[in-house]
């Protein structure tokens, strides 16, 4: 049991953490208002792994701890090629949409605060983004994560189509694959 806990700690040490939002919420009861906090956190290793978590508690530090733990449980793998994403994608979450486009080396990260935090921690250095619709920080972060989940690694696409990676980039079609 202890070895599993040690392995988890080693696995998580490499992650960098960012707090996206701290929101005070209140529940009205007949005894008065019960205040609590909701925290949205992002973790990533700047090398293709990123996760999003939400924590709720009566105190801010406890909510932050819960959010970071939740983010570490929800880590996804992002295909990063030459510092950018392999293809254009639109991530969606409720009324928020995020357009993610690959960019040439030297472009940098063209993104707003929430989307920037997610793509930086994913290890993407060159990307063009545009937030469409609602700009709620939680929904934007989730839309970005959903978009990154939809990305396809060119090597996997080439293997599925039984062609080379170069042919994937050139858009070559084989006879019979109309």
Swiss-Prot record:
InterPro entries: Ribosomal_Su5_D2-typ_SF, Ribosomal_uS5, Ribosomal_uS5_bac-type, Ribosomal_uS5_C, Ribosomal_uS5_N, Ribosomal_uS5_N_CS, Ribsml_uS5_D2-typ_fold_subgr. SUPFAM superfamilies: dsRNA-binding domain-like, Ribosomal protein S5 domain 2-like. One of its GO terms (biological process) is translation. Keywords: Ribonucleoprotein, Ribosomal protein, RNA-binding, rRNA-binding. GO terms for molecular function: rRNA binding; structural constituent of ribosome. Belongs to the universal ribosomal protein uS5 family. NCBIfam families: rpsE_bact. The N-terminal domain interacts with the head of the 30S subunit; the C-terminal domain interacts with the body and contacts protein S4. The interaction surface between S4 and S5 is involved in control of translational fidelity. Part of the 30S ribosomal subunit. Contacts proteins S4 and S8. This is Small ribosomal subunit protein uS5. It comes from Thermotoga neapolitana (strain ATCC 49049 / DSM 4359 / NBRC 107923 / NS-E).
């Amino acid at each position: 049991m202890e070895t599993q806990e040690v392995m988890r700690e080693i696995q998580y040490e490499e992650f960098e953490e960012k707090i996206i939002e701290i929101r005070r919420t209140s529940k009205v009861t007949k005894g008065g208002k019960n205040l609590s906090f909701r925290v949205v956190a992002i973790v990533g290793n700047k090398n293709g792994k990123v996760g999003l978590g939400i924590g709720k508690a009566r105190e801010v530090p406890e909510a932050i701890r819960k959010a970071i733990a939740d983010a570490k449980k929800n880590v996804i793998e992002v295909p990063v090629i030459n510092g950018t994403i392999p293809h254009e994608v639109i991530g969606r979450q409720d009324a928020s949409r995020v357009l993610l486009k690959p960019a040439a080396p030297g472009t940098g990260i063209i993104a707003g605060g929430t989307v920037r935090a997610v793509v930086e921690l994913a290890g993407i250095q060159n990307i063009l983004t545009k937030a469409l619709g609602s700009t709620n920080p939680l929904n934007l972060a989730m839309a970005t994560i959903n978009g990154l989940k939809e990305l396809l690694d060119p090597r996997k696409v080439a293997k599925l189509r039984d062609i080379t990676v170069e042919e994937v980039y050139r858009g070559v079609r084989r006879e019979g694959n109309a």
